[in-house]
Each structure stands twice: as C-alpha cells, then as structure tokens.
Swiss-Prot record:
One of its GO terms (molecular function) is uroporphyrinogen decarboxylase activity. It comes from the Bacteria. This is Uroporphyrinogen decarboxylase. The record marks 75 as: Transition state stabilizer. One of its GO terms (cellular component) is cytosol. The keyword Transferase does not apply. One of its GO terms (biological process) is protoporphyrinogen IX biosynthetic process. Pfam families: URO-D.
C-alpha cells in the first residue's frame, strides 16, 4: 500500500513538497470516455444519487491523470432542493428554478437542511471514497451565497444579474435574510462533508464578478466571513475560494480568512502575488487552451509554473472548468508535465 499523497495539503501549510500539486475543476465526468459510457446507461440524477457510481466518477481522474486531489462529483445546487427550492438541471442551460425568491416571505418559507436526512447519498459517496482508500485528499464544496442567491432570484443563469442586484439595492431586508439562510445551510452542508471525510472545501463563487468592490464589501463580505469562520469553527480544514471574473476583488478576498485564493485566467499569478497575496494561489490556465496544440500550451504552462514557484505556494489548476470536448490525454499530459517541471531538487 502506497502512502497517501498529501502534497496539496502540505503546499497549503507551507511544508516541503516534491512538486506543485495539480487538480482540475470539473475533472470528474464530462470529458472522460468512461463517464460518457456511464451516461449511456444512467441519468445524471442516477449517477449523482448512487454512491457507488458517484464515487467511481470522482475517483476516475485520480487514476487516469494522477491528479493530486479528487473533487466530489456533485453540483452546487445539491443542497437547495431539500430546503424547498424547485431546481432542475436542464441540458444546455444549467440550473433552472421555478419558485424564485421575490420577498422576505419567500425566504421564510425555506427549510433547514439536515444532510444525513436530505442528502445521505452525498455523505455515503464521501465515506465510500474514504473506505476505498482514495490516495489523495478529497475536496468537498459549496456554492457561495451570492452565486446561489443569484440563481434563486433570477431563476437560472443570467448575463447581467439585474434582478439580483435590484433586490440587493432596494430590499435589503430580503437580501440579508436570504444571505443568512444560505450561509447557515452552507456551513451545515460543508461540515457534513468534512465529517464524512472531505479534507478541503472549495467555495465556488461563479458570478461574483458582477459586483464592484464597494458593493461586495457591503452586501456580501459579512456573509462570506460568517460562512468561512462558521466552517472553520467546527473543522480545521483548508478553504479555497474561487470566483470568475473577480480580479478586481482580489484585495477584498485576500482579507477573508481563506487559505487558498483561486484565480481565473484574466490575471496572472505574478500580478496576484505582487498585489500583496501571501496565501496559496490556485490556477490559472485558460481552459480554452486545452483545445490547442501542445506547442501552444507548453509556454503558457511554463509561465504559470515559474510564477507559482516564485510565489512559493501554488496549486496548479485551470481558470475555470474542463470542457466536455477536451481530450483526456491532454489533462494527463499536463499533470505529468507540471509534476516534472516543478520537481523540487
């Protein structure tokens, strides 16, 4: 039995490592032929609700690509249905919600989550992976309050988040009631994942880039602080915060009690480091480059890895998720290249 590869945890703690750790957002499913074969037999609902299937999909990229972490194959919407949100994942669209939040009474109708009762299949998947002696740390995750709220108010993905921002600006009572409810839910859900065996938590804030720094500080930051501190009060595990198009919020994020700051491809690790970030930085290859030839990918990798080693604490990842069209061999090649290029002498 090989000893466990804890490189990602060591990197975050500032301990000595043999190489820069690698994992990919959306590494589980989508681009993998084994997953596509599974989808011919089972629906997405069946895969996510059957722990054996879900654990298999979660484990695949660790076996196939040799990544330094696994991320649970779930969706950020998972805890919403149990609290009374009528959400469906529609192909080609994403999450669609029919009972949108419009008033404080709508928020008051939402229930509380009990993970053991409401999402036992999530916890059973994590336990199964732990029992199978997954050789790398497992990342659990939650959606950030703003991103979850935007889905619940808009009814689905949005280009401008007009309804979400309008509620923020004109109905603070409803807005902060919704924030509080989502923070409570996410603390409970994240804690249950950790108790089942997750060793890190990533907070996905996909749509936070819609806000400027002033509005983030007033309408969002207190909720984010309460979420992060709430998880850490119960469990001493590293927390990664990742957002899209949020370069202008790096200073605000750096002041949050997170351990890892995840960046997209719109900035650089050097710029992030130079702005005063001393935490571990995660990122940040443009996922579109995965469709490019290797001679285009390699110099971009070199730059990211050089800047990461200069910064000192770096987890290699993409600037967003893996596309379904990506060749799995490319991910395998990148992982091997990162491990080799960053091998500590």
């Amino acid at each position: 039995m090989h000893s466990k590869n804890n490189t990602i945890l060591k990197m975050i703690k500032g301990e000595e490592v043999t190489h820069t750790p690698v994992w990919f957002m959306r590494q589980a499913g989508r681009s993998q032929p084994e997953y596509r074969a599974l989808k011919e037999k089972y629906s997405l609902f069946e895969i996510t609700h059957q722990p054996e299937l879900c654990a298999y999909v979660t484990h695949l990229p660790v076996d196939n690509y040799q990544t330094d972490a696994a991320i649970l194959y779930k969706d950020i919407m998972t805890p919403l249905k149990p609290i009374g949100v009528d959400v469906e994942i529609k192909s080609g669209i994403g999450p669609v919600i029919s009972n949108t939040i419009k008033t404080v009474q709508d928020v008051e109708k939402l229930g509380q989550i009990d993970p053991k009762r409401d999402v036992p299949y999530v916890l059973d998947t994590i336990k199964l992976l732990t029992e199978e002696k997954l050789n790398v740390p497992l990342i659990g995750f939650v959606g950030a309050p703003f991103t979850l709220a935007s889905y619940m108010i808009e009814g689905g993905p949005s280009k401008n988040y007009h309804f979400t921002k309008a509620m923020m600006f004109r109905d603070e009572a409803t807005w902060f009631a919704l924030m509080d409810h989502l923070v409570d839910m996410s603390i409970t859900y994240a804690s249950a994942q950790i108790e089942a065996g997750a060793e890190l938590i990533q907070i996905f804030d996909s749509w936070i880039g819609a806000l400027n720094a002033v509005d983030f500080n007033y309408y969002i930051k207190p909720s984010m602080e309460r979420l992060i501190k709430g998880i850490k009060a119960q469990h001493d595990v590293p927390i990664i915060l990742f957002g899209v198009n949020a370069t202008h919020l790096i200073e605000e994020w750096n002041n949050l009690p997170i351990d890892v700051l995840g960046i997209d491809w719109r900035t650089t690790i050097k710029e992030t480091s130079d702005s005063g970030v001393a935490k571990t930085i995660q990122g940040n290859l443009d996922p579109s480059l995965l469709l490019a030839p290797w001679d285009v990918i390699q110099p971009r990798l070199d730059k990211i890895l050089d800047e990461g080693m200069q910064h000192g604490k770096h987890i290699f990842n993409l600037g967003h998720g893996v596309f379904p069209e990506v060749n799995p061999d490319t991910l395998k090649q990148i992982t091997a290249y990162v491990h080799d290029y960053t091998k500590r002498k």
